[in-house]
Swiss-Prot record:
Polar residues: bias regions: 23-69, 98-109
Region ranges (Disordered): 1-109
PTM comment: Phosphorylated by CDC28 at Ser-44, Ser-51, Ser-67, and Ser-97. Phosphorylation occurs during bud emergence and is maintained until the G2/M transition. Dephosphorylated at the end of mitosis. Phosphorylation is required for the maintenance of polarisome components in hyphae.
Full protein name: CBK1 kinase activator protein MOB2
UniProt key word Thylakoid: no
Phenotype of gene-disrupted mutants: Leads to hypersensitivity to cell-wall- or membrane-perturbing agents, cell-separation defects, a multinucleate phenotype, and loss of cell polarity.
Organism: Candida albicans (strain SC5314 / ATCC MYA-2876) (Yeast)
Record family assignment: Belongs to the MOB1/phocein family.
Length: 313
């Protein structure tokens, strides 16, 4: 793993610069089917500007009343407040920022004896690029600053996720995926600048997330890279929000595009990457287990295989 073979620049020395944070082309999840160009801290990975995305998302938003961090399912509903902040698209300034509130609405599905999703079927569920647990490579190394380690890993993981999404992006059309769903029973909604929850096409939701995360990573006041820069008091909160939105992209791809991943012979890379991501967010408590529900059967399967360390009881 390129970013784990060296922790160059983590000491916040005078030689540290943005080039140290750029991903290597020899990263473990690199593949001939993936783009060779990694995300740079000064580049936006989106094809559309935030202002264009905003104008697209504004149409018809008045018809929706749900929260962007809600997970809706058919059947009986249950609602509770979540302390994590949801994302809010700022149409006035053309940028994305988190809102101060979010809620989760869950309902239990009455569907029984349904066929398991493809990613839970043999042999795909056991396919992996790396064997063994990822715990040892996500743990905080000795003499490394806690926030530096979080920042470096989030940057690397987001870069890899963005590249994987680029592989299946052409299939994620608004017509094919009119909602940001993670299976038939889970749907993610987006809170706009007016506080309204809108049901966006998956591609637009993901573009909003990518734009927001990219802006965070490029913001020196949030993810400082210059010598002497201090991490802000809400840095951990930003890490949690970024990790939560990254998980939703994982969930959408697993439930809707895993067949394309298989067709491109990337299932081993994808499974190992997801196991790595979950190991990292579990190690630093960045995502609540309730938020992982759309992929919880897969996570528990990986735990049984030893790819992810099970939580101590």
């Amino acid at each position: 793993m390129s970013f784990l073979n060296t922790i160059r620049g983590l000491g916040r020395g005078s030689k540290k610069n943005k080039k140290d944070l750029e991903p290597s082309n020899n990263a473990i999840y690199s593949h001939s089917n993936l783009s060779g160009n990694g995300l740079r801290r000064t580049q936006s990975p989106t094809k559309f500007s935030p202002s264009k995305l905003s104008s697209k998302g504004a149409q018809g938003s008045a018809a929706y009343t749900s929260s962007p961090t809600k997970r809706s399912r058919t059947g009986q509903s249950l609602q509770h407040q979540d302390s994590q902040s949801s994302l809010q698209y700022q149409q006035q300034s053309g940028s994305v920022s988190p809102s101060k509130r979010s809620s989760i609405q869950t309902t239990k599905s009455t569907t029984v004896n349904a066929d398991p999703p493809l990613f839970l079927c043999e042999p795909y569920v056991k396919t992996a690029l790396v064997k063994g647990s990822f715990k040892t490579i996500v743990q905080l190394p000795k003499y490394v600053d806690y926030c530096e380690w979080l920042a470096l890993n989030i940057f690397e993981l987001f870069n890899h996720l963005n590249r994987f999404y680029g592989v299946i992006q052409e299939y994620a059309t608004p017509e094919a995926y009119p909602t940001m769903n993670a299976g038939p029973n889970t749907n993610y909604l987006w809170v706009n600048s007016s506080g309204q929850a809108v049901n966006l096409p998956a591609c637009q939701y993901i573009e909003y997330v990518i734009t927001w995360v990219t802006n965070k990573l490029n913001d020196q006041s949030v993810f400082p890279t210059k010598n002497g820069g201090a991490f802000p008091p809400n840095f951990i909160k930003d890490c949690k929000n970024i990790s939560r939105q990254m998980f939703r992209i994982f969930a959408h791809i697993y439930h809707n595009h895993f067949d394309k991943i298989i067709h491109l012979s990337l299932e081993a890379h994808w499974n190992s990457f997801f196991a790595h991501f979950i190991s990292f967010v579990k190690e630093f408590n960045l995502i609540d287990r309730t938020e992982m529900e759309p992929l919880l059967p897969l996570i528990e399967n990986f735990e049984q295989q030893g790819k992810i360390t099970q939580a101590s009881k």
